[in-house]
């Protein structure tokens, strides 16, 4: 029991010593952390002071430094005159500081000159940055994707519906043709070797011709409804009559195949009902055509 108690006492002493050492280490760490925080705060203050000094230098401190030198100039003779009695010693003492004070003026003037010389150096990078920013702003709108998205449709953005190909072709037809001249001028103005100039020009002309032909063909397929209504008021009647005739034929085939009792009339009476819309006058069909438009069904 005595040995165990002695061992326990030794362990407890060691633990106490370790705890004391840990406390000392913790105090040292706290002191170090406090020192580090103080150093960081001092660095922040120095950064703020340097920024303020730079602002003062760029703002206009030379106007304040030069008057200080002019104010300090008359202080020397006043102090010299009030210092000692009138005599040759006083004159000599007054003459010596006057010579000493004279070189101070050009030094301060030189300081003012340095500050004045620093101003354009600090202002030049800002002007250069503004010029570069303006240059980037002028370069960005030349992107062909932005022009396509902005000029492809005047009223709506480029939205692809179910008929994607028709939508894209319609947007291509709506594009202005004036941009082609600028693009041709840009491609012609680019520097190319002599052997490839003729080939590139021929390819460009062929592509332009095919594009113009394709565009004219598509525009002829997609007519302007308002213009055609003014020139030919009844231009939509034959297409509508054909569509109606086709629908009536389909209805007739279905009725004959199914044999349903929907049409109680005899077979002799059916063609009468079918022939009436085909032989009807265009005036009777015009009010019914107003609700349906072929252009809206094909072109988005």
Curated annotation (Swiss-Prot):
GO molecular function: protein kinase binding; protein serine/threonine kinase inhibitor activity
Stretches with biased composition (Basic residues): 246-256
Pfam families: FAM212
Expression by tissue: Enriched in the nervous system.
Disordered, as annotated region: 59-104, 178-201, 230-288
Biased composition (Low complexity): 93-102
Disulfide bond positions: none
Keywords of this entry: Nucleus
Name the UniProt record assigns to this protein: PAK4-inhibitor INKA2
Organism: Mus musculus (Mouse)
């Amino acid at each position: 029991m005595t040995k165990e108690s002695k061992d326990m006492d030794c362990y407890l002493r060691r633990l106490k010593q370790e705890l004391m050492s840990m406390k000392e280490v913790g105090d040292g760490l706290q002191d170090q952390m406090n020192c580090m925080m103080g150093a960081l705060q001092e660095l922040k203050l120095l950064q703020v002071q340097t920024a303020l000094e730079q602002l003062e230098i760029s703002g206009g401190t030379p106007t304040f430094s030069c008057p200080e030198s002019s104010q300090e100039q008359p202080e020397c003779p006043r102090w010299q005159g009030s210092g000692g009695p009138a005599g040759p010693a006083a004159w000599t003492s007054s003459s010596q500081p006057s010579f000493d004070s004279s070189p101070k003026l050009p030094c301060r003037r030189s300081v003012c000159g340095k500050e004045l010389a620093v101003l354009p150096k600090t202002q030049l990078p800002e002007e250069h940055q503004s010029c570069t920013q303006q240059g980037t702003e002028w370069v960005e709108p030349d992107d062909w994707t932005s022009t396509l998205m902005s000029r492809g449709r005047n009223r709506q953005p480029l939205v692809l519906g179910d008929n994607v190909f028709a939508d894209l072709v319609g947007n291509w037809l709506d594009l202005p043709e004036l941009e082609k001249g600028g693009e041709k001028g840009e491609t012609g103005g680019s520097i190319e070797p002599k052997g490839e100039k003729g080939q590139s020009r021929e390819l460009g002309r062929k592509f332009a011709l095919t594009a113009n032909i394709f565009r004219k063909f598509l525009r002829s397929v997609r007519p302007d409804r308002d213009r055609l209504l003014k020139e030919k008021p009844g231009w939509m009647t034959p297409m509508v009559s054909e569509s109606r005739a086709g629908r009536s034929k389909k209805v007739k085939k279905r009725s004959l195949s199914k044999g349903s009792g929907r049409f109680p009339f005899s077979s002799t009476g059916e063609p009468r009902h079918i022939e009436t819309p085909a032989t009807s006058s265009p005036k009777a069909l015009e009010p019914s055509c107003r609700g349906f438009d072929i252009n809206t069904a094909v072109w988005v």
